[in-house]
Amino acid sequence: MMIRWKHRGGDIIFLMFTTLAAVSTASEHEHRTHMCSAEGNICSENAATVCRNNTCVSACSLRGMQECECDAEEDNYCYLCCGNSEHQCMAAHHHNILRPNGERWEREACSRCRMHGAELEGLPCDDTDSARLCIGGRCSNSVCHTKSPGSVCDRKMEKLCVDNTCENPCARYAPHLMVCDCPSIDQDTGFASEDRCQLCCYDFNLKPTNRRCQNAYRKYKIMDMFQKPIWRVGLECAGGKVCNKYGVCSSSHISFLVPFFSVILVSLISFI
């Protein structure tokens, strides 16, 4: 701010820089936010800080440790992780670092999943991340690491594993498109359908009688990260076969091996 003061025919200008005062005030405010009076109380839930000697410090420091990143993705997401040169970086409760009430430093979403895992199994555990599901009592986004590409990965059977992510790939085109299984037999030709082993979608906004399960690649150009159709690996197709990793309806690996083992068995019997 500038104040102009007229004096004896000349202007004596006093420049008062309020920005200096603002910086000083902000500094004092920041300093106050790191001060506390209730010893042992939580200063910030999000920052995982507690009051010690009238100062807000990291809960990890109570055991002489620093915040770090856990090896397990789920632990790193759900918990405060602590460690130092002598102790491995782990979830804080493994180092007996707990909240003042004895509970873990843990996200609420993860706590619900851990304590109510049976009823929440396969359901989204975090409203801010739809790909993160409650799996085995853990709030995880790695459910697809142990599943085949294109396989169902949620309890509502609305999402598939695509590029190691549990999602509704049809929604990439429009939110009202839903995942479906194209029929094994093509109704027009009466032969095995080539669409069965690929991602198919239907329009939820249409009346059930008007909904058609259609090939997502041809109809909507929905592809995987390699710009290829999304295969439904492991899905049962015509003739009791299964869809393979190339999007082809074929016999299972066991069926392929049966003739091979039969030849070996006959050879062994002949040799004996």
UniProtKB/Swiss-Prot annotation:
Keyword Membrane belongs to the record: yes
UniProt entry keywords in alphabetical sequence: Membrane, Transmembrane, Transmembrane helix
Membrane-crossing segments per the record: 9-29, 252-272
Subcellular localization, as worded in the UniProt entry: Membrane
Membrane topology: Multi-pass membrane protein
Cellular component annotations (GO), alphabetically ordered: membrane
Protein name per its UniProtKB record: Uncharacterized protein F15G9.5
Organism annotation: Caenorhabditis elegans
